[in-house]
Amino acid sequence: YEEGKKHLLWAFWDERGYQRFEEWRMGVLYDTFEYEYYENGQLKEEPSYKNRMKHGKWFRYFPDGEISGVREFSKGVRVGEWVDYYRKDEIAFKGLYNNDKKDGPWIWYYMNRGAVGEQGNVMSEVDFRNGVLISEKCYTREDGEIINCQEIFGENDYRFADQKN
């Protein structure tokens, strides 16, 4: 406290078990962020904020501490390369955001490297321009043959769950 008002960084655990931090300046809440942990104590996500907005790289972790994903934000907006992993640097998907919209190639991979076929372990390649789907290809795991993407993903295609078109 300073002059009877909350001041500087305050840390506490909330009712959900998240570790919260609040930055106060002479009684005015300036910024807040939180950390979520697995039951084993391992950090789930390492957020980064600036002026109360998501900003910078966010790292996500598996319960054993391995990185499960990397996200990037600029002033609360999704930007840059986003990557999720299965395990030990084995990529599940990767793609780019530009001004909160998917932009350029997004690639989803089958688990376990070494799948046969020209496309290796690529499950699908989707090309976006400013958030709009331009083209899409899906591949069979066995021989890399191009197939209808519905055969892999079905009607509830999670690859487009965040689209705001």
Q: Where do the model's predicted regions map?
A:
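Glycine/tyrosine- and acidic-biased, solvent-exposed loop/turn segments at the edges of beta-strands
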Residues: Y1-N165
